[in-house]
Amino acid sequence: MNMSKTTISVKLKIIDLSSEKKEFLDNYFNEYAKATTFCQLRIRRLLRNTHWLGKKEKSSKKWIFESGICDLCGENKELVNEDRNSGEPAKICKRCYNGRYGNQMIRKLFVSTKKREVQENMDIRRVAKLNNTHYHRIPEEAFDMIKAADTAEKRRKKNVEYDKKRQMEFIEMFNDEKKRAARPKKPNERETRYVHISKLESPSKGYTLNGIKRKIDGMGKKIERAEKGLSRKKIFGYQGNRIKLDSNWVRFDLAESEITIPSLFKEMKLRITGPTNVHSKSGQIYFAEWFERINKQPNNYCYLIRKTSSNGKYEYYLQYTYEAEVEANKEYAGCLGVDIGCSKLAAAVYYDSKNKKAQKPIEIFTNPIKKIKMRREKLIKLLSRVKVRHRRRKLMQLSKTEPIIDYTCHKTARKIVEMANTAKAFISMENLETGIKQKQQARETKKQKFYRNMFLFRKLSKLIEYKALLKGIKIVYVKPDYTSQTCSSCGADKEKTERPSQAIFRCLNPTCRYYQRDINADFNAAVNIAKKALNNTEVVTTLL
């Protein structure tokens, strides 16, 4: 056995809040959000007239700066920025830039002290009433928001450039015969399909001329929408649903199941409930061990969280995270392949490494979420009408769908991890996080969008990953290519297999034991995923 570190999160719910306490907590969250949004807007205004002078090399991906005389310090250094705030543009070095626009210097512009005054239009204390420590932390939150927004904008711009490049390829294919190559016709195909000459080796089945024309129109609309969104002024309002606290601010009274946060709420007592009964002996031992681990952490902090509950009201939580060492297994008898789908929530199949075959435990998890979301769609259509009886009751029904989805995903993930632990197997899944969005078509029907929203890959896979790592079980992500089109028994490709429906897979290879037999498509895909992980082929990432 070898030890491995993993992050564990424990959430305590604050319960039995009076109306006064709720109002007090709610006001503090709103004040925190107001101050953060104010700070973000002022920082953006300050940095608006600064221009980055670095150029990135394509090969090394490193920033290159021209050397010159800094207009502030007068030394010959690398010039990183051009400051246009004080009339004439001034080219400045990294040290001078940090001295004027670094995080620490900008923070001083917002927070006044006994020895330092700030301008009235920059003073956070005039905007919101908060704890003194939070006044100093709010500029950090604002910088994080700006950084996240800029990263998202860069990603959107990159996607627009990629879409424009793809659109140009389709235009070339449509207008110039030399730029397109014909794919060999299949028996059932009426029209010839083409691919761009630069993509002859790609597995794409190609596009008909009408299909190419539709692609050009669809991608044009997509690019237009994206550019319109990029041209708008971006003002990001901070929701203020998470506040960072130092752990020593929180005082626990386990005998009464209460906490106090004197730095924020003076002597206000807040009743809590946790993942186990605080009053029981096992609960006391659990929390004693938990506090000991928390206090050993170098960065000792927690979060006060505000969430919207199923009835539309706010709920409050105290969340702690800490790193714990878990025993990682080195010896595995096989692999548990997990295929997450739409019609069925998931299929988990154990594949034995010695016998080279699928055997028990095998579990196909039904998807109750599909019915819940279909019912939700009907309710939304119903509520869109002008007059609906019992409107408030219907809205309450809508708000209760998310907790049911969360519970279903947690229950399924727990069962899958228990199966792997019992069978002494590691878990393998498809790596679909980036692939789903990239493969989306420019134009989707409402039905396609609806069924895509049924797919809970990210939510369920992250829960499986988290619960498995706590047990010391290895997670392997493999490429999703052809897992649902290849026969798990004989390895026949998509040309010798067929899918009569989404739930059924059929092999057409006469030598295969599944020849002309209808088998579960999710079972077949799960076995293929397990085989890829065991053979160490097309593995993307391995955790633990």
UniProtKB/Swiss-Prot annotation:
Pfam families cross-referenced by the UniProt entry: Cas12f1-like_TNB
Note: Part of a type V-F CRISPR-Cas system.
Domain notes: Has an asymmetric bilobed structure, with a recognition (REC) lobe and nuclease (NUC) lobe; the sgRNA:target DNA is bound between the 2 lobes. The REC lobe (residues 1-312) is formed by the WED, ZF and REC domains, while the NUC lobe (residues 321-529) is formed by the RuvC and TNB domains. Has a split RuvC-like domain with the nuclease active sites.
Catalytic residues as annotated in Swiss-Prot or TrEMBL: 339, 430, 522
Record region (Linker): 327-334
Enzyme's top EC category: hydrolase
The EC number(s) this enzyme carries: 3.1.-.-
Family as reported in the entry's similarity comment: Belongs to the CRISPR-associated endonuclease Cas12f family.
NCBIfam families in UniProt: IS200/IS605 family accessory protein TnpB-like domain (TIGR01766)
Name used for this protein in its record: CRISPR-associated endodeoxyribonuclease Cas12f2
Stretches for region Target nucleic acid-binding (TNB): 486-520
UniProt KW keywords: DNA-binding, Endonuclease, Hydrolase, Metal-binding, Nuclease, RNA-binding, Zinc
Residues binding Zn(2+): 487, 490, 507, 512
Function of the molecule: CRISPR (clustered regularly interspaced short palindromic repeat), is an adaptive immune system that provides protection against mobile genetic elements (viruses, transposable elements and conjugative plasmids). CRISPR clusters contain sequences complementary to antecedent mobile elements and target invading nucleic acids. CRISPR clusters are transcribed and processed into CRISPR RNA (crRNA), which requires a trans-encoded small RNA (tracrRNA), but not this protein (in vitro).
Taxonomic source organism: Micrarchaeota archaeon (strain CG1_02_47_40)
